[in-house]
Regions:
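Acidic, metal/cofactor-coordinating or nucleic-acid-engaging core segments within structured domains
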Residues: 184-243
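Short, charged, surface-exposed secondary-structure boundary motifs
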Residues: 168-178, 288-292
């Protein structure tokens, strides 16, 4: 019987690792309080309540797509000094853009750096010995950054860490939202899309505009691009793994949350294994019903091919 195991964060939590995003919240708050404040200020625009901010961390990757860019612009306008101001200096050509970059870079670069150091600490925690029976000859698709499969279960082959492995310093850990950013158009793109006459009219209309504003929009656009999880690209880069699943007869899903962000991977698994039996873990009764709904109505798995079990 050829098997595929799909491993989610609940697998590490089951083994006692403090790997929830709530734990990451505490880590960020201690190690970079300024970043913590920026996350809760700009990534949860709909509410200021403590309960709502906890929800932000519960669905942290999705929350990266909640950037309140209007609030970000309002903040940066404090650094947008009018041309001809009595105190004008050349540095004012860049203060608006710099204030935007400081925040967007912290929500991208600093956040990812801190994620890696946190996972490195998590990965040092010795997992408890409540082992789950696993088939060493199976294939493994892991959504975790940690080495629990390798260290506790002594598995070493046929494991794809689809979002990266913390020990691989040469690759970036994949983290992001699912909102595909709109393509940004360069001045050359705009020029090529118009007739010469229309382009001259366009330039005349923009003649009085502040170029710092346009540069600021590029900075915000870069945030959306850099924080986007391009699942199609990730699948394409790992197509060899998915193409090798055609003979899989059983799929064992352990500790996966079935986040909408990651459903593209599961669609690809289903495409390769249309007749496989699914054995799926859940933690709460609410999850049990939600997972069944996703499997049947979104992924198209036949109901008689699904078994759910409590973990």
């Amino acid at each position: 019987m050829k098997k595929l195991y799909i491993i989610g964060n609940g697998f590490d939590l089951y083994h006692g690792l403090p790997s929830s995003y709530y734990s990451f919240r505490d880590y960020v708050k201690i190690h970079d309080p300024e970043l913590f404040d920026r996350i809760e200020m700009y990534l949860y625009p709909t509410s200021n309540s403590p309960e709502a901010n906890l929800d932000l961390w519960k669905i942290f990757e999705e929350s990266l797509g909640n950037l309140d860019d209007d609030k970000l612009r309002d903040f940066a306008r404090n650094y947008l000094v009018e041309y001809g101001d009595d105190d004008w200096s050349e540095d004012y050509n860049f203060t608006y853009q710099r204030s935007l970059s400081e925040i967007t870079d912290s929500l991208n670069i600093q956040l990812r750096d801190l994620l890696r150091t946190w996972i490195q600490d998590v990965d040092k925690v010795l997992p408890n010995k409540n082992r789950i029976p696993l088939d060493k000859d199976a294939k493994y698709l892991s959504f975790n950054y940690t080495h629990t499969l390798e260290n506790l279960y002594e598995l070493s082959k046929d494991i794809l860490h689809i979002h990266g492995l913390v020990s691989d310093e040469n690759s970036q850990l994949t983290l992001g939202h699912s909102q595909e950013p709109k393509p940004r158009r360069t001045e050359e793109d705009i020029k090529n899309s118009m007739s010469a006459e229309s382009y001259e009219e366009y330039k005349e209309e923009r003649a009085g505009d502040d170029p710092r504003i346009y540069e600021g929009e590029d900075i915000i656009g870069e945030y959306w691009e850099n924080s986007y999880k391009n699942t199609s690209k990730i699948i394409s880069e790992n197509q060899f793994f998915f193409d090798d699943l055609k003979d899989i007869e059983e799929i064992h899903v352990i500790g996966l949350s079935f986040s909408p962000i990651d459903l593209d991977y599961l669609h690809e698994v289903c495409r390769q294994t249309p007749n496989a039996k699914w054995y799926v873990s859940f933690h709460t009764l609410k999850e049990k019903e939600e997972f069944r709904e996703v499997l049947i109505n979104i992924l198209g798995v036949k109901e008689n091919n699904i078994q759910l079990f409590h973990l």
